[in-house]
Amino acid sequence: MNLRELQEMYDLAKLTYKEGVRLEVRDKIAELLRPIDVDVFNGTYKAEIFDEDTAMGLSDEEFDKHEEREQAVRDVLRECEGQLYEMVEEIDEWCSVCVSLYSNTTIGIEVEVDEMKFEYEFKNRYSK
């Protein structure tokens, strides 16, 4: 076996490992975000988060109900961030996790593990 063949085998192994980690993290995200109905394959989630346009014209009672739902989503995300960090730490101790509501309609998750960075983005199915 020459050096080039060895390098190709190494590159393939590295790629396979990276893809395996990416899928493992994706599955962990799906598991943790199940309460807000995340679909990791379609990059969507289903939670009634509202924006200012939607909020206008709502009664105080309706507004409060929407606000409670949005807070519930934020609570799930905060809890998910901690749990995801613990799960990913099992793969490699050098990891970081950042879960955020990028806007009223998008959840963004960034995971860095073993010097590999993965970004996952989920769009709200309710958004226009």
Name these PLM-found stretches.
Residues 1-4, 8, 53-61, 117, ...:
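Short intrinsically disordered terminal tails
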Residues 19-52:
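An N-terminal amphipathic alpha-helical segment
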